[in-house]
């Protein structure tokens, strides 16, 4: 089965704690969930989704709880698959909850500890996202160095011109910084 991670919301931008998706605890221990999440990788095909929702707005980040959502249950809806310029091997969509009932068994960890869980996943994920960028940059740098040695202008390789050397040096400095 394929899973997904649902933290981002249409209006929250980079502030993940500014979420509006709410989970209201019921007398029987279940939660009724309402709200939207956006840019959910594997959302169009996921059977299970780890969802983060506000259970206590007064507590900020400590009022966010994680849930394991079964997309086959009533109250869960998928939006259209979003067009993307890259990383098209994994489909992305918006998801919506309308009176989705999550049982107490669907809570991951403890009530209010969801954001701590999300942060741990995000920290590891950021390395995974940055790594391909560094690899692509390394390849671009090598290609640029080869090109400036080969391409000639005014009878000499363009790599002999000071402005080109400065651009290549800047590229190398930025690449070295990214690799750290």
Model regions and ranges:
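Glycine-rich phosphate/pyrophosphate-binding beta-alpha loops
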Residues: 12-13, 38-44, 87, 124-128
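Short glycine/proline-enriched turns and hinge-like loops at secondary-structure junctions
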Residues: 15-17, 42-47, 60-63, 88-90, ...
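Glycine-rich beta->alpha junctions and the first turn(s) of the following alpha-helix
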Residues: 76-177
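A short core secondary-structure module
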Residues: 30, 34-78
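A short, Trp-centered hydrophobic/proline-enriched beta-strand micro-motif
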Residues: 1-8
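A structural signal for short hydrophobic beta-strand segments in well-ordered beta-sheet cores
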Residues: 21-24
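Structural signature of FAD isoalloxazine-binding scaffolds in flavoprotein oxidoreductases
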Residues: 15-19, 70, 96, 100-102
């Amino acid at each position: 089965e394929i899973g997904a991670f649902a933290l981002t919301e249409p209006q929250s931008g980079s502030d993940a704690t500014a979420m509006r998706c709410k989970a209201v605890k019921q007398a029987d221990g279940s939660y009724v969930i309402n709200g939207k999440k956006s840019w959910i990788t594997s959302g169009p095909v996921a059977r299970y989704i780890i969802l983060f929702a506000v259970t206590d707005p007064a507590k900020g980040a400590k009022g966010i709880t994680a849930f394991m959502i079964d997309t086959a249950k009533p109250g869960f809806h998928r939006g259209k698959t979003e067009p993307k310029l890259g990383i098209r091997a994994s489909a992305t969509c918006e998801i919506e909850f309308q009176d989705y009932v999550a049982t107490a068994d669907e809570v991951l960890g403890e009530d209010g500890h969801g954001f701590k869980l999300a942060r741990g996943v995000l920290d590891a994920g950021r390395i995974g996202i940055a790594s391909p960028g560094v690899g692509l940059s390394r390849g671009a740098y090598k290609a640029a160095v080869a090109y400036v040695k080969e391409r000639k202008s005014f009878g000499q390789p363009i790599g002999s011109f000071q402005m080109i050397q400065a651009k290549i040096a800047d590229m190398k400095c930025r690449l070295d910084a990214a690799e750290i």
